[in-house]
Amino acid sequence: MPSTRQRSLRATIAALFIPAMLAGVSLPAVAAPAATQAAAVAPYKAFDAWSDKFAEDWVRLSPQLATSTQYFSGAEQARLDRELTPLSAAHRQKAVAMAREGVKRLDGFKSQPLNETQKISAAVMRWSLQNVIANEPFEDHAFVFSQFSGPQIGLVNFMTNTHPMRNAADVDSYLARLDQVAVRLDEALVRAKGAAAKQMIPPRFILERAQFQVDHFLKPAAAENVLVTTLAQRTAEMKDLSPEARSAAIARATGIVEQKIRPSYTRVQAFMAEIHPKTGIVAGISRLPNGAAAYKRAIENFTSTQLTADEIHTIGLREVARIEAEMDKHLRSLGLADGNIETRMKQLDARFQPKGEGDPRPAIIASYNEMVRDAERRSASLFNLKPRAPVDVRRVPPLTEPSAAAHYTLPAPDGSRPGIFWVPLRGPTFDMIRMRSLAYHEAVPGHHFQLAIQQEMSDLPKFRSQRIFSGGSAHSEGWALYTERLAVEQGWYKDDVPGLLGALGSELFRARRLVADTGLHTKGWTRQQAIDYGMGAQETERYVVWPGQANAYMIGMLRILELREKAQKELGDKYSLPAFHDLVLGAGSVPLDVLGELVDNWIAQQKKA
């Protein structure tokens, strides 16, 4: 059972969820009477017609989103598959203007008798669009060429991993897009220069990470560039592409890279060299003009709460103490009693490092795949909803691996690409005892269950199943961390104390994130302080360029646990863990305040059943 302190902590979090996101839209506990539903047919149709059309127009703003979701079909999808999303400030303003218009139209539906699905859709759309509007004043606080999501790597990753390559038409679309890469990079460069003119520049250690990526991209000759070699690899067995046409496509791609793309990267390289002397070592966003307001907005965006940075910092310290006490007990059972938690975990890690002289990476990937298959079997009794799409484990590509974190990408809706759990394997040491918890988090029953199930939900509006309007990081990352805790609760680590310690270490890591993220951005922490606190260099640098996001994991998990505890307490024998999981996953990505209302309504329904 949860401790009194844990229950109090969760209650505090529950009380701080932003109620304004629903903006007067109350989610019903039971279906409306038939007469009311009949009278509401016209408004229902009006909302569906508007929301479907608005979502389509929103996707049209981002051709890359259209491709990753395959949102359209026929000629329109084919047209969008030939375009890259503009990266200009003007395009950003166009999106903000559209978001404002969307919120205005949603206001008009407040008084309409929408059904339950529509009310949830309206709440999710409103939350997402309001964030677009609220985030706009702080867009320049984010370094355009971030080592995690900047276009210098984002465009390459999209072209080599996401752009479909099924037939000759896709090859032609690839070349059309390739011809736009330099334009998009130049648009981003204009924005970066504008931000730099306002003293919005990254810390030196962040800039140098991005410089490394640009240098790495420019190192090979055009014919050996990843944008060319990937095209060659992906077309090698293409049935409707003749050898002559394939050779011509590769030659054209080589020419585009040489004549357009390499010069654009050289321009970015020169810009980075120009601002390098102006960079400093201060890590937090507070170093920038209006940085405190930017961080407050980031917390609201990523946690869906009104928690302050100080409150999050305190929650983190409390959770760290709780988890470390549990880890100490298990470490002592393995004979590791001397030193702090960090020292003893390093000693444990050393015991499980790969042995032998060969490259251990292929075997590690194979082990990850075995762990995912095992998790699928273990999850069978805990979930009614399961994804149809498979999930694969792959190593992060070389261009991004030096600074990448493990992550998950969705399967293609048409089945041409599985869900993918991407693992960075930099070496020379590897997180062997944390492999199971990472597999649960990123794949099964974590992100793959959550996101692939949502994509496959035929009873949701298309814009929700395809996550066109996000419900926020706290739901998605909170769920993934919740599944790590679930594995511990369900005894998946029975007879595997090192694996259990790896899982607890992962949870400790997320608790420390609360402390480190708020420390970096509001308490003057240096990069080295965060590293010394146990974050690691790559993770620390991620928090620097993505303020607030690290808070989503633990805050989201605590909220889901609080809601589960509430359901168990109020429903007693009527409570079902698989049914609770169905509820959390079945609505798709929603803000946590919306999830709270859904759980309350579900409890009311179950009591009446």
Predicted features and spans:
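N-terminal secretory signal peptides that target proteins for export/translocation
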Residues: 1-7
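Bacterial N-terminal signal peptides
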Residues: 12-26
